[in-house]
Amino acid sequence: MLFFRASTDGTATDATAALENLYAGNDPTACWLVGSGPSILGAPVEQIAASPVVKIGVNFSGRGPDGTAPRITPDIWTSFDPTSRFHRSIFLNPRITKFLKADKQKDLIPGTTFKACDCPATYFFRSETRGYGDFLDSRSDRILNALDSFIQALDIGYRLGFRRFFCVGADFIIRPSDAQVSLAVSCGIDFDETSGVLVTKDADPKLHYRSDRLVDFVDECIRKFGGKDRRAVIEELESAGREQQYSFSETKPLAAAIHADSHYWERVQYLRLARRNLSLRGVSLVSCSPGSRLNDWFSFREPLTVCDEMTAACGDPREERTVGRYSGDVRDAVRESLPHHRDVSPYDWAQTVSRRAKSDLDSAPT
């Protein structure tokens, strides 16, 4: 039982048959996988929201600053994080299909007396850890657990039938602020906007290297800030001016941001090491997030170009005409392609159906 509905009495109703490969079609089905990195603030969100494909969201993806409407409202949503972190406008919205871990089915929804299993369009799943060789596995009855909402969403999307994932707002990096960089440079730290800080922890200059990891930036500051301890350096960096961590109104303490950035870096390595598995499963992961760590290992596409291609593939209602659809001969709409359509049965199909029917009859209980 991969996906199921749940009740407050603990009973479960299998929904796998209705959901697995629901979105698969004659061509590899595309979707937007929406994150909450700062890059989404510069993305063409109106065109993305209007594009004719499903938007899969994680956590607070698509949210802007407090007091503003969501920039993108997801069609499908999931999160690895605690239920209490998120708003009821996600859980109680029947337009958003939610996928939650099985242990969250009786969590209370913030601001309500409802449990997660009471919410509309909400499904649950059990999870498991897997290696890179079976990173995505259609034979499993569980979703991949990598302690990460993005990877969880990727596996859910795969089981729903999506094969092309266009990732927007998926930065997978927390960069130091301009003020923090200026402070570091004034203390003799070598920082490059593209490749990050020059790490000099080894005395041999030949072993120095560039790193875009926030932990390396802070550690280098500790080495160069005149003998100050780690706590004092972090406080000084925080007071200089905070880094932009998300597209929405929230900023973690710098110590927590360091941990989050290391998590992002590691999960990108997971995806890099799983590329052959993704290829074998027919999955294409495409970054549409400028400056994302994904861009080192996966192809990058401009989101507007992707929007245009999606619209061209699905059809543009703005260019379609309804005149004549009731008053004319609608067969004209397909007549040109009819000469190329000749449906045929599979080889020896009548005998195959007969054999299957006999086999089912023979195996039926008496």
What are these regions (language model features)?
Residues 1-366:
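Metal-ion/cofactor- or nucleotide/acyl-coenzyme-handling active-site neighborhoods
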